[in-house]
Design a protein with these regions (language model features):
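Short hydrophobic/aromatic-rich motifs at helix boundaries and adjacent loops
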Residues: 15-17, 87, 144
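Conserved catalytic cores of soluble enzyme domains
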Residues: 1-79
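Short acidic (Asp/Glu) and glycine-rich catalytic loops that position anionic groups and cofactors
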Residues: 23-24, 44-51, 89-97, 148-152
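Short low-complexity stretches enriched in small and charged residues
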Residues: 7-13, 101-109, 138-142
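Alpha-helix initiation/capping motif
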Residues: 23, 36-42, 90-93, 102, ...
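Non-catalytic terminal/interface segments that mediate subunit docking, oligomerization
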Residues: 107-172
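Terminal amphipathic helices with adjacent charged low-complexity linkers/tails
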Residues: 55-116
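Glycine-centered secondary-structure boundary/capping sites
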Residues: 32-33, 102, 132
Length: 172
C-alpha cells in the first residue's frame, strides 16, 4: 500500500517530515502547479486540513515522548484491560466546574477547561488537536482508569457537527 499511514490507528509526524503519495516534482509536471513538500505533506497540512495525522512532534525525542504517553493509556493487547494508576481524589468535589459552563445556552465556553476539571490531575491527551476543532477527542483518566473523551467544542461552530468533526469522532 503506497499510503498505508492513513490506515494506521495513530500517526505522530515530526515538524521536519513530509507524508504524501506523489511528490512536488510530479505535481509540477502533471499540473504545472508549484507546491513545496511542506505544503503538500507537512504536518500542518495533515493536522489542519486532511486530518491524517494525530499528533505533531517538534522532533524525534518529542515523538517518542508522545508515543510513550499514548501507550500509557492503552492495554498491551486486546485481552488485557487498560493500565490502572493511582487516581486524583480532587475530582470528587470540584465546585469550579459549575462556573465553567454558562447558564445561557447561547454563550460559548472552552470544553477543554471542563475536561481538565473532571479528569485526574487535569491531564488530557488530545488527539488531532488541530483538526475539526468543533469536536475534542482524546484520552484521560478518571479515578485512575483510562477513558476516551468525545466532546463538542462550543467555541467553534457552536459545537455543531460537520463532516470533518463527525469523521474525527467516528475514527476515534
Amino acid at each position: 500500500a503506497a499510503y498505508s499511514p492513513a490506515l494506521t490507528d495513530f500517526i505522530i509526524q515530526t515538524r521536519q517530515a513530509q507524508l504524501f503519495i506523489t511528490g512536488p516534482q510530479v505535481i509540477r509536471q502533471v499540473t504545472g502547479e508549484k507546491v513545496t513538500a511542506e505544503q503538500l505533506g507537512g504536518p500542518d497540512a495533515h493536522m489542519l486540513h486532511s486530518g491524517v495525522i494525530h499528533f505533531i512532534a517538534e522532533d524525534d525525542a518529542h515523538a517518542v515522548m508522545l508515543c510513550k504517553k499514548l501507550l500509557s493509556f492503552l492495554p498491551a493487547n486486546n485481552l488485557e484491560d487498560p493500565p490502572q494508576i493511582e487516581g486524583d481524589r480532587r475530582v470528587e468535589a470540584n465546585p469550579a466546574l459549575a462556573a465553567m459552563v454558562p447558564t445561557e445556552g447561547r454563550q460559548g465556553y472552552d470544553v477543554r477547561n471542563v475536561i481538565a476539571g473532571v479528569v485526574d490531575y487535569g491531564d488530557f491527551l488530545e488527539v488531532q488537536a488541530g483538526f475539526a476543532a468543533n469536536i475534542v477527542v482524546g484520552f484521560a483518566r478518571i479515578s485512575g482508569g483510562t477513558v476516551g473523551i468525545v466532546a463538542n467544542q462550543p467555541l467553534v461552530l457552536a459545537g455543531a457537527l460537520d463532516i470533518d468533526a463527525s469523521d474525527k469522532a467516528a475514527r476515534f
